[in-house]
Structure formats: structure tokens, C-alpha cells
Swiss-Prot record:
Family recorded in the similarity comment: Belongs to the ATP-dependent AMP-binding enzyme family.
CDD domains to which the protein is assigned, alphabetical: ACS (cd05966)
Residue numbers binding Mg(2+): 535, 537, 540
Keyword Acetylation: yes
Designated name of the protein: Acetyl-coenzyme A synthetase
Length: 649
């Protein structure tokens, strides 16, 4: 059966920034002559000292390095704010919608945002923050989070945002890893009508972080929280004393911009480091072309700033392009399942960019929640975070978009800085479930397990053969880990960790992770991190974690747990372990299934056979493959006999 194909609507082909002929021309130039292409497109942002060098990159061990525009200087905050003031200073930069529809929204102009950023930048300087210093941001989805990011960029400090859903332990680990002495937080966050104790979490985390000497706290709910004299500062009071004039720091293109921690296939999360010049070019260019963005349009990316999508497509990309960007504090189903679409109507949103997890959850609630709203303003829809299944794609297209809005299904990663494989709405015929074709300058390829290039329609491991400006530069404090993680599996190639199918039209279909990483609701969780948390429990001897299919989240978390000899596992312990993991990492890591077992399947050399556990987790047990190397086959029999009966599994 052939896949459905949605041709480019005529009005899009005629009016979009890029039609098919232009895509082919630009793409060809970008891969045949990257120097010339990026010399031209690198000028889309303002440089203080223009670059003369464009691309200096190698994925090979002997001369490994990634440098773009390396002799140019710029300031990202100035590109987001100062350069717009003359033309659109009084236009709205951020439209903020609170968690509750009963609370007033906020409209912040470019001029006001510029003043807010300068004041906060001056506050950071008054607290001794220097260029290159790390500032940890643990804030809810409020405009002050964007202000904090831009203030760091303005003075050359490196921000490290920790998602406000992470636990005190996870926060402490990230503060310690980047050696941050200043933390920005809020008394509480609001999410789906519930209060999130952010300041209490910070206080708990800082018991493990003696190096932190300053906490700047925003009052969001007015809750009565502990205030440590000499360390804690009230945000509003301190900012009010500062001048609204702060000169932007001149940054080299390769100076660090931010660290964002992401789960890897081995234990501790890695601090993905992005630098200033290449990232700025990539975030602004992908935002403009992927969303066919024109000044004056209302654009909404429904991601949290705690994830890379929030960095690139809520804050930096849109603001560099002079957009009006919607920032939403709430969740899709509070107070009811029409919340997203009510916000679309309220602000006349033209471009909406959301995650398949949210869409699947809303699809399950029924069409009436969508249809009670107009959504007439929508012209383009986007999807991000994980592959979108064709059923959800069709629902998004037909029900949310009334069969008239193209969908840009974007594939990318924290490591890539912005979209890599994506449709362009005026150029790409759409296939539900396919990320389609590479963005300019991206050279994807499929290889087999031995690293042999595969041609034509085939399945394989997705790699990228050459650098692009938005690429991460290193893992904070561990350059060797960066090289080993991404460039040694297939020598001289960037290994994405994703499996992929390419069809006869050259479209790419992401099939999911092929390393030990689970994609839960569009957020990467390293299985090793969850396993470490489980094994840290005093009653647990051993744990192995795999992904399992999940109707809403895409993948769920399936944990196999072996208890210490004297422990009799029961439902009480199961609940205890679930709470334990939530506390150690955060709610995002909550196991969906915990299966207790007397032992785990191992080879004679003691290695856990994860392949077998994955099959059991996926309930694909008819063919477990070669089990001849199992030290004790009865272990597998026990797992199969005691696998919980799951709904839909």
C-alpha cells in the first residue's frame, strides 16, 4: 500500500519563500559549495566584526574540530533586540499566556524587552557575573525566563537552563557539573493548576552545591518560601535599582552561548555546548525558512524553555527574525482539552509548532474540543520532539488544520541546534509520518552496522557526513566524551543515534533510537540514568530499563528490577520505586511498568542482553533471536511467564 502524499497547495508554491525549484538550487549550492553558501547566508545576522573565515571543520580524529565564522564577532542579544528597535520597537516581541485563562496575559514590546534585558544584565554584572561564567536558570515558562537568557547572552555569560520539572538531585548534578555559582528561580511554578515548589527544590539542591553564593528569586505566586539572608535576592526589587542601558559584549563566533544537559546512553547527562555565531545563523535561518516566517505573523512554539526547542524556537530564532512569539505557561488539557486552540483564537496564531505526545493526548479526548474553536487564523502547523505517527498526523491536518494547513514535521536534536530534516511548506509534498528532506547544508546518509553507506530505498543508521553551523561544539568539561559519543561509532561521520528509513523518493522516515535512549513524550531519557536511580535504592540489587510502545507518550519506560536477596517484592515496593525515581530524576522519568524478576538475562561474560529485554518490553516475544549465549535460559522463561498484562500490549 502506497503512503498518502499531500502535494504543495498552489498558493503556497506561488507565495512561499522557497518553492521546489529554489529548494533544489539552494540545497545543491549548500552541499556543493558550503563555503560560498554560508558566506552569503551567514550575513543574515548582524556582525560587529564581519567574518572572513567560513567553515573550518573535520569529523576525523587526526584533525577533529568544528569552527564556523571563527574570526567574526557579534552579540546574540543585540541580534534579538537592538537591531529591531528602530523599525519595530513598539511591536510585540512576546505574547505571554498564563497557566490559568482567568489570569491576564502579558504583551511585551521589543523596546520593553530590551529595557528588561539590560536591567537584568546589569544586575548579573552587579553580582560579579563575568563573561564565560555559567548561570543556572530553573524557571517556569514566564517572560522573565527569556529575559534571563538574553541577559546572559548580552554580557557573555553562559546559561544552563534546567527544566523546571527536574528534581532537586537532578538540578544539583547540573549545577555542580558546570560549576555555577548563581541560580535564577521562582518561588513556585504553575502548571495545569498545580503549584511546583521551585524555590524549595533549589534550597534542597543547594545542600549539595556549596559553591552557589547567589539565588535570584522571581515571585510568581507570592508563596511564603524560605529566604536565605545574604544569598537570596528578590528579583523585582533588585532589577528596579538597575539602569536600562547595558552595552552588549562583543563575542567571538566560537565563544560559548549555552549549555543544555541531555540524556545519553551512559549514566550522567551530558552538557551539550552551543557557541554564538553558528548557532545564531542556524536558529534564525531554520526558523524563517521552515515556518515560512514573515514579520508581523503571530508564531507559537508550544515547547518549554527547559528543552532545546524552547531555546531555538520560542526565544532565539523568532526574536532574531523580529517575530511575535507566544510563550505559554500551561498545559494542553487544563482547564480542558480545548486550551491550545482557545489560545490560537485569542492571539490569532498563524503558525503553531507542537509535540506529537500532546497531539495524541488531545486526539484521544475527541474532535469536539477542537471544533468548538475557530482556528481560522492558522496557516501552518509543525511537529517536533519525536516521529509523529501517520494517524496523529492525519488528525492534526484534518481536524486541527481543517485540511488546509501544511505540516512541517521536523527532525533534529539538542546536539544539532535546530531543524535538520524537514519539509519546507512551499516546496515539499508531504507524507504523513516522514520528516521528508534535509535542510540546506545538511548531508544525511544511511549506513549499516559496519559503517558501509547504503544507497537508494533502505533502512539503516542515520548519520550526517559533514558539519553545519548549528552543530554543538563539545560536551561541557569532557571533549573526549563528545568525540567518543558522536564520531567513533562510524569513523568520520556524526552518528545521530537514530534509525531511519529512506524511501524511493529520497524522503527520510525516523524509526527511533538505536542506542540506549528512550524518547518519552519527545524528551530523551537515558536508560542508564534511570537504572542508576533504581539501583541507588537500598532494596534493589540490579535494574535494566528499556522502552515500550505507549499510545500517548510514544515510548514508555519499562523497568526490570532484581531485589536484594532478603526482599520480597510487592506492589508497595513497586509504588515506592516509582516515587523514588521521580524524586531522583523528576516526573518525566516515571517508570510505566516495573517487572520484578529473580534475575536478568546475561551472557556468560556477565553482560545484560538488552535486546531480549527490549523484545519483552515491546511484547514482541515470538522471536527472541539467538539466545545461545545466555548463561541461564530459565531467567528469560521467568520474565516471559511473569510479564504484566498491559492494556493494548
Amino acid at each position: 500500500m502506497g503512503e498518502a502524499v499531500y502535494p504543495v497547495p498552489a498558493e503556497w508554491a506561488q507565495n512561499a519563500l522557497v518553492d521546489e525549484a529554489r529548494y533544489q538550487d539552494m540545497y545543491r549550492q549548500s552541499v556543493d559549495d558550503p563555503e560560498g553558501f554560508w558566506a552569503e547566508h551567514g550575513k543574515r545576522i548582524d556582525w560587529i566584526r564581519p567574518f572572513t573565515k567560513v567553515k573550518n571543520t573535520s569529523f576525523h580524529e587526526a584533525d577533529f574540530g568544528i569552527r564556523w565564522f571563527e574570526d567574526g564577532t557579534l552579540n546574540l542579544a543585540a541580534n534579538c533586540l537592538d537591531r529591531h528597535l528602530a523599525e519595530r520597537g513598539d511591536e510585540i516581541a512576546i505574547l505571554w499566556e498564563p497557566d490559568s485563562p482567568d489570569e491576564a496575559h502579558r504583551e511585551i514590546t521589543y523596546r520593553q524587552l530590551h529595557a528588561d534585558v539590560c536591567r537584568f544584565a546589569n544586575l548579573l554584572k552587579a553580582k560579579g557575573v563575568q563573561k564565560g561564567e555559567r548561570v543556572t536558570i530553573y524557571l517556569p515558562m514566564v517572560p522573565e525566563a527569556a529575559v534571563a537568557m538574553l541577559a546572559c547572552a548580552r554580557i557573555g555569560a553562559i546559561h544552563s537552563i534546567v527544566f523546571a520539572g527536574f528534581s532537586p538531585d537532578a538540578l544539583a548534578g547540573r549545577i555542580t557539573d558546570c560549576d555555577s555559582r548563581i541560580v535564577l528561580t521562582s518561588d513556585e511554578g504553575l502548571r495545569g493548576g498545580r503549584k511546583v515548589p521551585l524555590k524549595a527544590n533549589v534550597d534542597e539542591a543547594l545542600k549539595q552545591c556549596p559553591g552557589v553564593d547567589t539565588v535570584i528569586m522571581l515571585r510568581r505566586t507570592g508563596a511564603d518560601v524560605d529566604f536565605v539572608e545574604g544569598r537570596d535576592i528578590d528579583w523585582a526589587t533588585a532589577v528596579a535599582e538597575q539602569s536600562a542601558d547595558c552595552q552588549p559584549e562583543e563575542m567571538n563566533a566560537e565563544d560559548p552561548l549555552f549549555i543544555l544537559y541531555t540524556s545519553g546512553s551512559t549514566g550522567k547527562p551530558k552538557g551539550v555546548l552551543h557557541t554564538t555565531g553558528g548557532y545564531s545563523v542556524w536558529a534564525s535561518m531554520t526558523h524563517q525558512y521552515v515556518f515560512d516566517y514573515r514579520p508581523g505573523q503571530i508564531y507559537w512554539c508550544a515547547a518549554d524553555i527547559g528543552w532545546v526547542t524552547g531555546h531555538s524556537y520560542v526565544v532565539y530564532g523568532p526574536l532574531m527574525n523580529g517575530a511575535t512569539t507566544v510563550m505559554f505557561e500551561g498545559v494542553p488539557n487544563f482547564p480542558d482539552a480545548s486550551r491550545f486552540w482557545q489560545v490560537v483564537d485569542k492571539f490569532k496564531v498563524e503558525i503553531f509548532y507542537g509535540a506529537p505526545t500532546a497531539l495524541r493526548a488531545l486526539m484521544r479526548e475527541g474532535d469536539e474540543w477542537v471544533k468548538k474553536t475557530s482556528r481560522a487564523s492558522l496557516r501552518l502547523l509543525g511537529s517536533v520532539g519525536e516521529p509523529i505517527n501517520p494517524e496523529a498526523w492525519e488528525w492534526y491536518h484534518k481536524v486541527v488544520g481543517d485540511s488546509r494547513c501544511p505540516i512541517v514535521d521536523t527532525w533534529w536534536q539538542t546536539e544539532t541546534g535546530g531543524a535538520m530534516i524537514t519539509p519546507l511548506p512551499g516546496a515539499t509534498a508531504l507524507k504523513p509520518g516522514s520528516a521528508s528532506r534535509p535542510f540546506f547544508g545538511v548531508k544525511p546518509a544511511l549506513v549499516d552496522n559496519d559503517g558501509t553507506f547504503l544507497e537508494g530505498a533502505t533502512d539503516g543508521c542515520l548519520v550526517v557526513t559533514d558539519s553545519w553551523p548549528g552543530q554543538m561544539r563539545t560536551v561541557w568539561g569532557d571533549h573526549e566524551r563528545f568525540f567518543q559519543t558522536y564520531f567513533t561509532t562510524f569513523k568520520g561521520l556524526y552518528f545521530t543515534g537514530d534509525g531511519c528509513r529512506r524511501d524511493e523518493d529520497g524522503y527520510y522516515w525516523i524509526t527511533g533510537r538505536i542506542d540506549d535512549v528512550i524518547n518519552v513524550s519527545g524528551h530523551r531519557m537515558g536508560t542508564a540514568e534511570i537504572e542508576s536511580a533504581l539501583v541507588a535504592h537500598p532494596k534493589v540489587a540490579e535494574a535494566a530499563v528499556v522502552g515500550m510502545p505507549h499510545d500517548i507518550k510514544g515510548q514508555g519506560i519499562y523497568a526490570f528490577v532484581t531485589c536484594n536477596a532478603e526482599i520480597e517484592p510487592d506492589d508497595l515496593l513497586r509504588k515506592e520505586l516509582i516515587q523514588w525515581v521521580r524524586h531522583e530524576i523528576g516526573p518525566i522519568a516515571t517508570p510505566d511498568v516495573i517487572q520484578f524478576a529473580p534475575g536478568l538475562p546475561k551472557t556468560r561474560s556477565g553482560k545484560i542482553m538488552r535486546r531480549i529485554l527490549r523484545k519483552i518490553g515491546e511484547n514482541d516475544v515470538s522471536n527472541l533471536g539467538d539466545t545461545s549465549t545466555l548463561a541461564d535460559p530459565s531467567v528469560v522463561d521467568n520474565l516471559l511467564a511473569n510479564r504484566p498484562q498491559l492494556a493494548g500490549a
